From Swiss-Prot:
InterPro entries: Mcrtin_ACTH_cent, Melanocortin_N, Opioid_neuropept, PMOC, POMC-derived_peptides. Residues 29-105 form a propeptide. The keyword Signal applies. This is Pro-opiomelanocortin-1. GO terms for molecular function: neuropeptide hormone activity. It is found in: Secreted.
């Protein structure tokens, strides 16, 4: 029996500590009482627990209605605030840097199908065609079809064998003999309106004179 009473003492002490930890004001009132100062006997412990419990019920207001509509107690509020550590409240810039490259990689991959994303292939550079000696160096880079086109163009439009003399350049104007309209025949210039008197046919004038003479003779006869 004595052993059972000794085992009950730690349990009562633990319950008393929980009640005292519920509020600072309740703890102060409990410690001021003489029964709570002398905890050697079980009667004093039970009386102290009842005193602290009554003080705790007096301090906490009782709300009418269902229990789920009542405001949370201080213990529940502390339990809710403990999981919110400073690391969870830290801004996104102070997060682990290893997670940011993955986000950037996903973003770049998702932006590939837009116009400003990654290019699909290399841009084609314009092919430079040289008409002088540099062409021999660039023939290796040109495809076979381009070389054939250049060869046919050279055959169709051959260059003049000799350059113009310096005297011809000084004296006369430059003749564009390599163009189709450079030197048309005189009969086709300006649509044939600028023909000379000798080149034009004189038959219309002769018929005109004959008609005038015949009319004058007819008037005289009348």
């Amino acid at each position: 029996m004595v052993r059972g009473e000794r085992m009950l003492c730690p349990a009562w002490l633990l319950a008393l500590a929980v009640l005292c930890a519920a509020g600072s004001e309740v703890r102060a009132q409990c410690m001021e009482d003489a029964r709570c100062r002398d905890l050697t006997t079980d009667e004093n412990i039970l009386d102290c627990i009842q005193l602290c419990r009554s003080d705790l019920t007096d301090e906490t207001p009782v709300y009418p209605g269902e229990s789920h509509l009542q405001p949370p107690s201080e213990l529940e509020q502390t339990e809710v605030l403990v999981p919110l550590s400073p690391a969870a409240l830290a801004p996104a810039e102070q997060m682990d840097p290893e997670s940011s490259p993955q986000h950037e990689h996903k973003r770049s991959y998702s932006m590939e199908h837009f116009r400003w994303g990654k290019p699909v292939g290399r841009k084609r550079r314009p092919i430079k065609v040289y008409t002088n000696g540099v062409e021999e160096e660039s023939t290796e880079t040109l495809p076979a079809e381009m070389r054939r086109e250049l060869a046919t163009n050279e055959i169709d439009y051959p260059q003049e064998e000799g350059a113009l003399n310096q005297q011809d350049k000084k004296d006369g104007s430059y003749k564009m003999s390599h163009f189709r309209w450079s030197s048309p025949p005189a009969s086709k210039r300006y649509g044939g309106f600028m023909k000379s008197w000798d080149e034009r046919s004189q038959k219309p004038l002769l018929t005109l004179f004959k008609n005038v003479i015949n009319k004058e003779h007819q008037k005289k006869d009348q």
